[in-house]
From Swiss-Prot:
Protein task: Involved in auxin biosynthesis in anthers.
Protein family: Belongs to the FMO family.
Record keywords: FAD, Flavoprotein, Monooxygenase, NADP, Oxidoreductase
Single GO MF descriptor: N,N-dimethylaniline monooxygenase activity
EC number: 1.14.13.168
Pfam families cross-referenced by the UniProt entry: FMO-like
Other facts noted in the record for this chain: Plants overexpressing YUCCA4 are male sterile due to defect in anther dehiscence and mature pollen grain release at anthesis. Plants silencing YUCCA4 do not exhibit any visible phenotype.
Induction of its expression: Repressed by the transcription factor OSH1 during anther development. Reduction of auxin levels at late stage of anther development, after meiosis of microspore mother cells, is necessary for normal anther dehiscence and seed setting.
UniProt-recorded name of the protein: Indole-3-pyruvate monooxygenase YUCCA4
Length: 439
């Protein structure tokens, strides 16, 4: 029996739907919408986002017999991984820390699976647990009316490309549910900062989400703006393709070896944190990093005053796990530059007064949450950055949940998903519903 009840039609005689459509849809999109075309009642949860987080929650809900629908604005699961990452990307942490609930990675996979291996794992995971998202469905607004969540969506008729916004259709479908799971994650939208004179630059400029590999960059002078994991790896990839790469370092950053003495730095640190304080583990990790790299400040990469794991706990700032970039910096194959003062027609002026010409600028300036743009709720999520106001929070009020916002990567996704599904099942039990679990 179909667990979703659909009510279709223009609803010309229903003022409730007319009022909601006019108030929520038109201002959010700027495109006139006559009214609601369809309302879908979901006797369970609406999950917004079909990345690893949304797929994991859907899989666990399905196993517990709880109805759900996953809404995804793109035409595939894990669209960030599939369409906005560089080809050489591998998981930065060992695979045991990146598994989704109930299914380990295949034993044949390397310790750090490639992007394509991870995507294959996600596709197989979704098939195994029967997670079938509603694709090309953009959520433009979601609000709680005192009883249910109303999630307003429009069909994506043309995907976003080249910095342009996606084109949305004119008909609206509303999903109404008791629970809303926000699974759009920390990296929903690229961050493109305002930079003085950027419009004057006549070379090529792109965000790192558009970069795939170094083919075609040989011999070109490329400036990578940003020194996080993406900036470091893009710079390394460019160097390996014989580009003349430079990397902007405008702030302090912790760079750690991905492995120490054959052990994962992250895994070793997590093991030590069972018995030692964060400050002690930071001291040990930084000592070992110094033995491997030397003083990174001499390379133009100063470290923060707080240790890497203490800094992560108080600010969410993730240390960089080096995969070979620092060796290229030491050899002079990758140049480190200070922050940009302003752009010129053919290059940039740096804050130290020096200037240099570049053919290409790649902005490895990160991503941001898009939750404030569509979720009409101000208590749980911050309007400033689109993250839960309390660190590691996964549960809000009125059946609102967040998965994948803990700044703990894929390991945090699994923890959040398990907590959310257990809470929903307990609420159903408290309401007197008994659902059979799938075997």
């Amino acid at each position: 029996m179909d667990c979703f009840a659909e009510t279709e039609g223009k609803r010309a005689h229903d003022p409730l739907y007319q009022r909601r459509a006019a108030a929520a849809a038109t201002p959010a999109t700027g495109v006139p919408v006559d009214d609601v075309d369809k309302v879908v009642d979901v006797p369970g949860a609406v999950i917004v986002g079909a990345g690893p987080a949304g797929v994991a929650v859907g899989a666990l809900l399905g196993l517990r017999g709880v109805a759900y629908v996953v809404l995804e604005r793109c035409g595939c699961i894990a669209s960030l991984w599939r369409h906005r990452t560089y080809d050489r990307l591998c998981l930065h942490l060992p695979k045991r820390f990146c598994e989704l609930p109930l299914r380990p990675f295949p034993a044949s996979f390397p310790e750090y699976p490639t992007r394509d291996q991870f995507l294959g794992y996600l596709d197989a995971y979704a098939r195994e647990f029967g997670v079938e998202p509603v694709f090309r469905r953009a959520v433009i607004s979601a609000e709680y009316d005192g009883e249910s969540w109303w999630v307003y969506t429009r069909e994506v008729v043309a995907a976003a490309a080249g910095g342009e916004q996606a084109v949305l259709g004119c008909t609206m479908t509303v999903y109404r549910s008791r629970w809303l799971v926000v699974a759009t994650g920390e990296n929903a939208e690229p961050v493109v900062p305002e930079m003085d004179g950027a419009g004057r630059f006549k070379g090529q400029m792109m965000h790192s989400s558009e970069y795939r590999n170094g083919d075609g960059y040989a011999g070109k002078k490329v400036l990578v703006v940003g020194c996080g994991n993406s900036g470091m790896e893009v710079s390394l990839d460019l160097c390996n393709h014989n580009a003349r790469a430079s990397m902007v370092v405008r702030d302090t950053v912790h760079v750690l070896p991905r492995e120490i003495l054959g052990f994962s730095t992250f895994g070793l640190s997590m093991w030590l944190l069972r018995w030692l304080s964060v400050q002690t583990v930071d001291w040990l990790v930084l000592l070992l990093s110094f033995l491997v790299f030397g003083d990174t400040a001499r390379l133009g990469i100063p470290r923060p005053s707080l240790g890497p794991f203490e800094l992560k706990s108080v600010s969410g700032k993730t240390p960089v796990l080096d995969v070979g970039t620092l060796a290229k910096i030491k050899s002079g194959d990758i140049k480190v530059t200070p922050a940009i003062q302003c752009f010129q027609e053919h290059g940039v002026e740096f804050v130290d007064g020096s200037t240099e010409e570049f053919d290409v600028v790649i902005l490895a300036t990160g991503y941001k949450s898009n939750v404030p743009y569509w979720l009409k709720e101000k208590e749980f999520f911050s309007e400033k950055d689109g993250f839960p106001r309390k660190g590691n929070a996964w549960k809000g009020q009125n059946g609102l949940y967040a998965v994948g916002f803990s700044r703990r990567g894929l390991s945090g996704v699994s923890m959040d998903a398990n907590n959310i599904v257990q809470d929903i099942v307990q609420r159903l039990h408290d309401m007197g519903y008994e659902r059979s679990e799938n075997n």
